[in-house]
Amino acid sequence: MSFDIAKYPTLALVDSTQELRLLPKESLPKLCDELRRYLLDSVSRSSGHFASGLGTVELTVALHYVYNTPFDQLIWDVGHQAYPHKILTGRRDKIGTIRQKGGLHPFPWRGESEYDVLSVGHSSTSISAGIGIAVAAEKEGKDRRTVCVIGDGAITAGMAFEAMNHAGDIRPDMLVILNDNEMSISENVGALNNHLAQLLSGKLYSSLREGGKKVFSGVPPIKELLKRTEEHIKGMVVPGTLFEELGFNYIGPVDGHDVMGLISTLKNMRDLKGPQFLHIMTKKGRGYEPAEKDPITFHAVPKFDPSSGCLPKSSGGLPGYSKIFGDWLCETAAKDSKLMAITPAMREGSGMVEFSRKFPDRYFDVAIAEQHAVTFAAGLAIGGYKPVVAIYSTFLQRAYDQVIHDVAIQKLPVMFAIDRAGIVGADGQTHQGAFDLSYLRCIPDMVIMTPSDENECRQMLLTGYHYNDGPTAVRYPRGNAQGVALTPLEKLPIGKGLVKRHGEKLAILNFGTLMPEAAKVAEALNATLVDMRFVKPLDDTLILEMAAQHDALVTLEENAIMGGAGSGVNEVLMAHRKPVPVLNIGLPDFFIPQGTQEEARAELGLDAAGIEAKIKAWLA
């Protein structure tokens, strides 16, 4: 998509923040309007995260107008809202390539631009990193400002509060901006509150505030009276007591779509000392009515026609694995009142919408709090219930200690339904589910299952749900199922694989949903094909049998080779002193960039042609 100068005449003048700061302030509302329209035009043609960026246009313009970026350092949390930032920082003409192979990264990325101070993708990291960056800037002595932008979802995570607690203790010079994009502008946002925010953020108020503290510090009753008076005055118009108690000077809430007001407030706050907190209210999906009405649906979008006001409907093909899980969850809950389902803010993505509506008293969305989700599940299990934690592979990493300390050591029957396992695609390095088999396999008493299709996935979910001797995990990929027939639910024998095809000389031991590719390769090479099903416990007997009957073995998985299922097979063979050659095929030792799942598998040699080529080269 080429940039249309006639359509966006003001935006055409801005290809860097230096050019932005040369614009007269009066032209900035027009720039915001063009930037929002350009974002709509670009993302609707290319796909990507959408509603969040529409809500941060004015904030982004104001930040880059007031602060001397990239010298001053701007940190975006998660990064869904950073598309306008990318457009204003030299990447305007490439925004149509975002999330595509070889295109712009879906999130702020240090290797892509000097304006991207912190590489992100997971939530709630900005304030912690910002404190470190602010401390480094102070020691550097170059008067460099630090600003963190965090959303109302990300700030609910414990890590954000840990960071703010630390900031209140060491008091670095930094600004945290809370982008609060609830469904409506707060009743406190208006002319009076914006005017008050500018007064409270000014140097005069700050000087009087700090000077008063020093003068009356030796007179405890008066000091306490002043504190209470200030809190009372602020409390009449702002909800900032919590952040004040953490040691921040709180300002807000203010209208996040008033670019001129934001500029005034930011200029006032730019030179204040110590940790500052600015609370802004924005509208997710701002400027595009369908996204304003349904920001969840328009959070991330495929290519669509903006004039239609709706996203393209599914082709009605095969259900996704998330839907398979959601259907199983509802079916099981209808039979067993002990089932409790937990998700860390991933209801839609994990296929739990129907469950949340049918069983609201047994559905728990704990927000972006993976650690809490796991230990909460442990408590439910102790109380005699049957918790199912639905979580993406990449986010389960954030609760690793809780899986070990709070669940596995106590042998609690918590089942982890691990979605987005393996290659995820367009969200790139931060979201690939590359490591779960490796980091779970080493945990004692953990049962790990890898279904080869949707029917086996259902059976494994049932098996894990009814396993009472410790935690279980069923991992399945992003994307559509394979269209196999669904059979009645029945428990599988723990730790037992299944031979799918008998061949000669070579045996392929497959773990998971690469089975269709493995079947093609087995047919081409006349190899034995085994659906291993369990990563832990491994079917040692079957592995040794395959080793005895074949000249070589190949393991296949969509997980990191290091420490994965193939490593487990190697360990079994070494423990029994079996000198059979083994080729481990899986994800290589680097972080996999964005692109479609098909592109990534082809490039990594995990499609049928690539797997066959790897095996032939190894056997040659």
Curated annotation (Swiss-Prot):
Subunit structure: Homodimer.
Cofactor(s) recorded in Swiss-Prot or TrEMBL: Mg(2+); thiamine diphosphate
Binding site for Mg(2+): 152, 181
Annotated EC: 2.2.1.7
Pathway assigned in UniProt: Metabolic intermediate biosynthesis; 1-deoxy-D-xylulose 5-phosphate biosynthesis; 1-deoxy-D-xylulose 5-phosphate from D-glyceraldehyde 3-phosphate and pyruvate: step 1/1
Pfam families (UniProt xref): DXP_synthase_N (PF13292), Transket_pyr (PF02779), Transketolase_C (PF02780)
Protein family according to the UniProt entry: Belongs to the transketolase family. DXPS subfamily.
SUPFAM superfamilies with a match to the protein in the record: Thiamin diphosphate-binding fold (THDP-binding), TK C-terminal domain-like
Known role: Catalyzes the acyloin condensation reaction between C atoms 2 and 3 of pyruvate and glyceraldehyde 3-phosphate to yield 1-deoxy-D-xylulose-5-phosphate (DXP).
A GO term, aspect molecular function: thiamine pyrophosphate binding
Name under which the protein is recorded: 1-deoxy-D-xylulose-5-phosphate synthase
Recorded GO CC terms: cytosol
Annotated GO biological process: 1-deoxy-D-xylulose 5-phosphate biosynthetic process; isopentenyl diphosphate biosynthetic process, methylerythritol 4-phosphate pathway; terpenoid biosynthetic process; thiamine biosynthetic process
Residues annotated as binding thiamine diphosphate: 80, 121-123, 153-154, 181, 288, 370
Tree of life domain: Bacteria
Catalytic reaction list: D-glyceraldehyde 3-phosphate + pyruvate + H(+) = 1-deoxy-D-xylulose 5-phosphate + CO2
Species name: Salmonella heidelberg (strain SL476)
Co-factor note (free text): Binds 1 Mg(2+) ion per subunit. Binds 1 thiamine pyrophosphate per subunit.
Keyword field contains Hydrolase: no
Keywords tagged on the record: Isoprene biosynthesis, Magnesium, Metal-binding, Thiamine biosynthesis, Thiamine pyrophosphate, Transferase
